[in-house]
């Protein structure tokens, strides 16, 4: 009898877990219905550029003194970064000469990097400013696309590609750090009243920003594209997407999973 009860309990738990997994993860007011793509964010430099050694040293120091963790909790609700820590790293590389560091960022990568009003903001942007402050440098941000990062570095338009960028690591002419953060591009609905599965999106309207990376992620799922009623490309960034979802103007949106911790 005890074995039968135990077996029944295990089956019940298994069924419950399968049911929950099919309904997506709920984060605050929102539900993650599907993960379309996983990205790894890295920082790119020109080969043998001394900028890397100073930036790396500053990052190790900021990781050791808790600055990076504080920023991560502010933007993500947790510290999910993987920077090396060394409180003495800046002392080991010596004093850096004053300069302006040109930082190439994806301006549509909330909450990593984005434009708010007339200025840049986001986790990567604030961290780059902290790095420059610790080095006695000034940060200047320039909008780029991940696919153009190496061209921008080679031309001298930027000194570092850093800000919501998933960089290819194949070109030996450039130096790319180990990934410091992993992110997913996901489909999100309202937790209350929204679709719980991809099947529930049949005939629905899905919105994304005008950045091509989101359409590329969606295009990998042909069955989903055929199931949707309408796909909208909207301007105004991530905030606009959540506004449209909250108002009922659209049924689902494509965003970074990291954004849910901020908006959820």
Task: Label each PLM-derived region with a short phrase.
Residues 45-53, 62-63, 118-126, 143-147, ...:
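Soluble non-cytosolic domains of exported or imported proteins
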Residues 102-110, 117-133, 165-166, 183-239, ...:
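Bilobed "Venus flytrap"/periplasmic-binding protein-like clamshell domains
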Residues 19-22:
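C-terminal motif of bacterial Sec signal peptides marking the signal peptidase cleavage site
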Residues 24, 35-81, 125-134, 192-195, ...:
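Extended ligand-binding regions for polar small-molecule ligands
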Residues 137-138, 154-163, 204-206, 245-259:
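Alpha-to-beta junction loops
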Residues 26-38, 45, 94, 125, ...:
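Acidic, polar ligand-binding/catalytic clefts
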Residues 59-95, 213-236:
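Ligand-binding clefts/hinges and TM-proximal coupling segments of bilobed small-molecule sensing domains
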Residues 1-9:
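Bacterial N-terminal signal peptides that target proteins for export
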């Amino acid at each position: 009898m005890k074995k039968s009860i135990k077996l029944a309990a295990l089956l019940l738990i298994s069924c419950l877990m399968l049911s929950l997994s099919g309904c997506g993860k709920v984060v605050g007011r929102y539900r993650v219905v599907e993960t379309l793509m996983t990205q790894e964010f890295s920082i790119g430099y020109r080969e043998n550029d001394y900028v890397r050694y100073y930036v790396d040293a500053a990052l190790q120091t900021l990781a050791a003194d808790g600055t990076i963790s504080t920023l991560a909790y502010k933007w993500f609700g947790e510290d999910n970064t993987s920077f090396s820590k060394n409180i003495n790293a800046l002392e080991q590389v010596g004093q850096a000469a004053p300069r302006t560091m040109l930082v190439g960022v994806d301006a549509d990568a909330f909450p990593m990097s984005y434009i708010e009003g007339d200025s840049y903001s986001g986790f990567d942007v604030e961290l780059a400013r902290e790095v420059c402050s610790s080095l006695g440098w000034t940060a200047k941000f320039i909008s780029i696309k991940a696919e153009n990062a190496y061209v921008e570095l080679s031309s001298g338009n930027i000194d570092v590609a850093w800000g919501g960028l998933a960089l290819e690591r194949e070109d030996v002419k450039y130096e790319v750090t180990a990934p410091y953060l992993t992110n997913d591009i996901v489909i999100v609905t309202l937790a209350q009243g929204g679709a719980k599965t991809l099947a529930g999106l049949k005939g629905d309207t899905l919105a994304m920003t005008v950045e091509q990376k989101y359409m590329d992620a969606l295009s990998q799922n042909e069955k989903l594209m055929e199931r949707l009623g309408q796909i909208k490309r909207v301007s105004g960034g991530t905030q606009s997407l959540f506004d449209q979802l909250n108002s009922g103007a659209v049924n689902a949106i494509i965003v970074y999973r990291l954004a849910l911790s901020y908006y959820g």
